[in-house]
């Protein structure tokens, strides 16, 4: 057990520092912006220091773990702890949230509340990825809903209330199943609740009960991932949210569902996962095709990118369902890769739409001439998203491909069919992305308009874009650095639960 509460400080620091925003002097929004960015940077630097000097990569066990009694009547303990599975999402959270606060620079209305909500999300996300207690996991899962709902309903587009209501209904509805499963697992087999992951991992359940727990948790995660048909909140939410909120949604929120699927369903309910895995692979395969086809028909720029996110998350679902070292490592790599790419595409889409005051693709055209910097960055991230070799998207999807091909869970013919359908999805991806680029940037529609003047990307936008582009290239050239974070933990999960 860790003697110094590093993780508690990392989890609590953003939201506690965020409360001080309301006590800052009334001297304009600039003080609030710089204060929030400094808090996010300090948190990111603290994370990096702790993980570099106090975390052993070759140890698959929980590290930096803490255990403090909180609510004795429920045997509820504050139990943070990290391993190779959680370190990647935590660092991604710190990186994307810091850049999202910088992207939110133009927000001036109620900026104190806006930036506090972003810091509250920051704490909730890190708390979820570092929790090793079922009830703490659930509380952090729910803590995320309130800031997202307020950010949507107060700083969104014209249909923001509809989108925010749809978001809260879907996610809260999914959380009901999580709420039923957590005490069920904790109370089974003993009079006193056992909510920590280590005890639950050693607990055996009747197959029917394990399937019931698994299915309930799966519904909750399927909303956040999202898995079709529980995905319809996502395009509406992305279509109305401010682009800094979209960065957090696409970059981090979707990853919470996949993380829960691995951390709880795969690690704690292995027999049920083995039964459900073919259906997960089937759902992921259909999701790639369906979302890519639907994206091609979207005329709203943000909704097109939102459906591309749904399509790319299909690769993560396939990797998790493959039950192989390669497939699960590929799923984790795809999580991190899409975290960068999704955040970047929504940021660039938002800045572009702010400049031209248009959101529909059929009204755009010719923007590349007055805005060459945005055109260059948008094209580069689109190439990475369509899995261009040398970028993170290509490596992640290729590793998932190899994972499903080498899986012992499936016969030869089903594997051929799955890889064939995945290949079709990878062909559809460049079709809708290149079509989107053509509609926005090529032609002369807007360029020939009278009195048209569009300002190109400024230093702030360029800085955010380049900061995201560097890890995209880095992962594409040397993915082993990211894979080394999780490879030992992945082997431990699979060897302990499937190959014994």
From Swiss-Prot:
Q: Which UniProt keywords apply?
A: Chloroplast, Membrane, NAD, NADP, Plastid, Plastoquinone, Quinone, Thylakoid, Translocase, Transmembrane, Transmembrane helix
Q: Which reaction does it catalyse?
A: a plastoquinone + NADH + (n+1) H(+)(in) = a plastoquinol + NAD(+) + n H(+)(out); a plastoquinone + NADPH + (n+1) H(+)(in) = a plastoquinol + NADP(+) + n H(+)(out)
Gene Ontology molecular function terms on file: NADH dehydrogenase (ubiquinone) activity; ubiquinone binding
Main EC class of this protein? Answer: translocase
Main localization (coarse): plastid
Q: Which residues cross the membrane?
A: 4-24, 37-57, 87-107, 113-130, 134-154, 167-187, 211-231, 242-262, 272-292, 305-325, 330-350, 386-406, 416-436, 462-482
InterPro entries referenced in this protein's UniProt entry, alphabetically: NADH_Q_OxRdtase_chain4, NADH_Q_OxRdtase_chainM/4, NADH_UbQ_OxRdtase, ND/Mrp_TM
HAMAP family attached here? NDH1_NuoM
PANTHER family found in the cross-reference section: NAD(P)H-QUINONE OXIDOREDUCTASE CHAIN 4, CHLOROPLASTIC (PTHR43507:SF21), NADH-UBIQUINONE OXIDOREDUCTASE CHAIN 4 (PTHR43507)
Name of this protein: NAD(P)H-quinone oxidoreductase chain 4, chloroplastic
């Amino acid at each position: 057990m860790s003697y110094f509460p590093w993780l508690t400080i990392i989890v609590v620091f953003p939201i506690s520092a965020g409360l001080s925003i309301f006590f800052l002097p009334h001297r304009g929004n600039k003080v609030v912006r710089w204060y929030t960015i400094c808090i996010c940077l300090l948190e990111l630097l603290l994370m990096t220091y702790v993980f570099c000097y106090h975390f052993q990569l070759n140890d698959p066990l929980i590290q930096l773990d803490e255990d403090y009694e909180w609510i004795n009547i429920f045997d509820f303990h504050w139990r943070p702890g990290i391993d190779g599975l959680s370190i990647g999402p935590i660092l991604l959270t710190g990186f994307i949230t810091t850049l999202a606060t910088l992207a939110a620079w133009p927000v001036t209305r109620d900026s104190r509340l806006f930036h506090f909500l972003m810091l509250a999300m920051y704490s909730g996300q890190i708390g979820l990825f570092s929790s090793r207690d079922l009830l703490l996991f659930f509380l952090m899962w729910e803590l995320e809903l309130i800031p997202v709902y307020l950010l949507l309903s107060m700083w969104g587009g014209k249909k923001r209330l509809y989108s925010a209501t749809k978001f809260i209904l879907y996610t809260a509805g999914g959380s009901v199943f999580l709420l039923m499963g957590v005490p069920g697992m904790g109370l089974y087999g003993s009079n006193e609740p056992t909510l920590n992951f280590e005890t639950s991992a050693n607990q055996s359940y009747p197959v029917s009960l394990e399937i019931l727990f698994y299915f309930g948790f799966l519904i909750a995660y399927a909303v956040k991932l999202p898995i079709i048909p529980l995905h319809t909140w996502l395009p509406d939410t992305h279509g109305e949210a401010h682009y800094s909120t979209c960065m957090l949604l696409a970059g981090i929120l979707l990853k919470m569902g996949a993380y829960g699927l691995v951390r709880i369903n795969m690690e704690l309910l292995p027999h049920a996962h083995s039964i459900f895995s073919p259906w997960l692979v089937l759902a992921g395969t259909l999701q790639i095709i369906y979302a890519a086809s639907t994206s091609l028909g979207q005329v709203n720029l943000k909704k097109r990118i939102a459906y591309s996110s749904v399509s790319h998350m299909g690769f993560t679902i396939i990797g998790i369902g493959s039950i192989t070292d390669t497939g699960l490592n590929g799923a984790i790599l795809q999580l991190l890769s899409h975290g960068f790419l999704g955040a970047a595409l929504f940021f660039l889409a938002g800045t572009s739409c702010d400049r031209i005051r248009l959101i529909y693709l059929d009204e755009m055209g010719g923007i590349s001439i007055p805005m060459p910097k945005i055109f260059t960055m948008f094209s580069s991230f689109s190439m990475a998203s369509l899995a261009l070799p040398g970028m993170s998207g290509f490596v992640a999807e290729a590793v998932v491909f190899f994972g499903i091909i080498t899986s012992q869970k499936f016969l030869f013919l089903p594997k051929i069919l799955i890889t064939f359908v995945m290949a079709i999805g990878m062909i559809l991806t460049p079709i809708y992305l290149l079509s989107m680029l053509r509609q926005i940037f090529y032609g002369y529609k807007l360029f020939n308009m009278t009195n048209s003047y569009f300002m190109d990307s400024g230093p702030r936008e360029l800085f955010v874009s380049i900061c995201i582009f560097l890890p995209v290239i880095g992962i594409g050239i040397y993915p082993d650095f990211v894979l080394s974070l999780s490879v030992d933990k992945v082997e431990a999960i699979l060897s302990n639960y499937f190959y014994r």
